[in-house]
């Protein structure tokens, strides 16, 4: 299930008007993260430019921020943009336990 939230941002020079959060994260991570925290993480992307990790055949640009900090807590955020859409999609998000972050 996906949930949509209105939110105005600029990411990679693109105007974003909404965030679509996939419920995938809830299967394993609902005790440490929720939609409100994810929206705060997404707000932290505002005004910045990122390089895509990959681009799908359907032209979805996949991004991974790891670590992405909210306060002093590290999170992993997997998100996507499409050149024809005005939304950012959140594929997955979770908090890194014990401060473990990938290098």
Predicted regions and their residues:
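Ribonuclease/tRNase effector modules and their secretory precursors
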Residues: 1-103
């Amino acid at each position: 299930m996906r949930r949509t939230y209105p939110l105005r941002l600029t990411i990679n020079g693109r105007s974003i008007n909404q965030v679509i959060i996939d419920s995938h994260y809830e299967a394993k991570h609902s005790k440490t993260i929720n939609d409100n925290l994810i929206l705060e993480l997404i707000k932290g992307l505002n005004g910045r430019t990122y390089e895509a990790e990959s681009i799908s055949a359907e032209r979805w640009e996949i991004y991974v921020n790891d670590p992405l900090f909210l306060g002093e807590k590290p999170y992993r955020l997997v998100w996507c943009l499409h050149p024809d859409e005005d939304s950012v999609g959140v594929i997955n998000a979770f908090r890194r336990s014990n401060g473990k972050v990938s290098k």
